[in-house]
UniProtKB/Swiss-Prot annotation:
Protein name, entry field: 2,3-bisphosphoglycerate-independent phosphoglycerate mutase
Summary of subunit composition and partner proteins: Monomer.
Residues engaged in binding Mn(2+) 2: 13, 63, 438-439
CDD domains: iPGM
GO MF terms held by the record: manganese ion binding; phosphoglycerate mutase activity
UniProt catalytic activity: (2R)-2-phosphoglycerate = (2R)-3-phosphoglycerate
UniProt EC number: 5.4.2.12
Binding site for Mn(2+) 1: 397, 401, 457
Cofactor(s) named in the record: Mn(2+)
Cofactor details (free text): Binds 2 manganese ions per subunit.
NCBIfam families: pgm_bpd_ind (TIGR01307)
GO cellular component assignments: cytosol
Free-text function comment from the UniProt entry: Catalyzes the interconversion of 2-phosphoglycerate and 3-phosphoglycerate.
Amino acid sequence: MKSVTPVLLLILDGFGHRLDGDDNAIALARTPNWDRLRRDHPYGTIDASERAVGLPRGQFGNSEVGHLNIGAGRIVTQDISRIDLDLEEQRFAGNPAFTHAFAAARGHALHILGLLSDGGVHSHENHIHALIRAAQAAGVADIRVHAFLDGRDTPPRSARTYLERLDAVLAECPNARLATVCGRYFAMDRDKRWERVEQAYRLIVDGEAAFQADDGLSALAAAYARDENDEFVRATRIGAPAPMQDGDAVIFMNFRADRARELTSALTDPEFDGFSARQLRLSDYVTLTRYGADYASLSIAYPPQTIRNGFGEYLASQGLRQLRIAETEKYPHVTYFFNGGEETVYPGEDRILVPSPKVATYDLQPEMSAEEVTNRIVEAINSRQYQAIICNYANGDMVGHTGNLPAAIRAVETLDGCINRCVEAMLANGGEVLITADHGNCEQMDDPLHQQPHTQHTTNLVPLCYVGHRPARILEGGALKDIAPTLLALMGLPAPDDMTGHSLVELL
């Protein structure tokens, strides 16, 4: 085994760089440790959004994109950009997975599922609109749209705009109609809260719902009257019941996998046991991108790109040991996404999953499981088993998404103590620390344009702080792609040729 300097990477999810603002949870929180680290150690900012991470211009980053870029050590062109290019160059409608589903739906219904917004994190309404038009042009006679409302990557009450734009598309396509509406809280869970997913499932599959409406806008107005923001709109059937039948085809239009898996499992897995689910014999089920190894039998419209010699794979090739650790909400990001969208656990790679608290929303427990994550990190550091430890702290993002400023402040203050414990343990054991974020969120908690809480990500730069025993400075102009090469340089290892990023810590 090579003798290297051990490193710890702390990824503070949703922790952007913004100096001022009376809605800035980071600036308002009491953070003596973070303040000291920024003051006494090399500190800078790096880019985590738009083209710097393979996204379209103007698109904020997210956890999946962030961890892909961090782990790859290069800009990874994101699925949204690949799909947008196909739309621009008029290849989208001819995608073989789509045309196969259109043919499979003849004599039956085609169900189009997806998050209806322009948030660009899990989906984009433009892709849904284009698919409806393509299905209509292909002669699909019965097209049913199941719209999941956002309010998390978009303002909390912004769905009217998206439903109006969908209505305009449906008016062009007489074979298509809106069949159901519900909030993403139910349809897009990722923490095995099956009681939520079941409500979306019963709505889509059985046409069962506590509420009915004649159209999407009426459904939304009724939900707002019940004081439900977009994310939490309860299952609502639009028009006559339209249950899913054997022989129907399904296309799930979310390009981000993590929040599409549970509903997909309920719809397709014959051994699904989260709740009582009907065994449907669908003619086709298309996922927009690959949702994981457990869904290998499903059709994929945009198969994954292959990323070789990312940070994890490269360390394994050098015979080094690494640890990935996060709580439930961000565990896939430090494992699957950090490894380039691969399920592979590399030789010498250990993983620790700390359960997230079972609360309805994380403003009810803004500390989340950060203390236990920290306990496990300190234990791992003191064991001296690992040459690299990769950790994600979820608090800034998950509490930031609630729009609750006091709770976000508590989340940041929790992180401040956790960061300090990790840094002290690492320095005591001869290691070095990089602290960064995958994207912004909790540094902006108010949306003055829409005059409501800001619950989505930001395009702000994110911090990069080096804490070690060597004098150094942070180079300017970096991005998330530079994190892996920086870690390798600190360890004393050359970066593989596949990595196009460069080290941002210049040792003096």
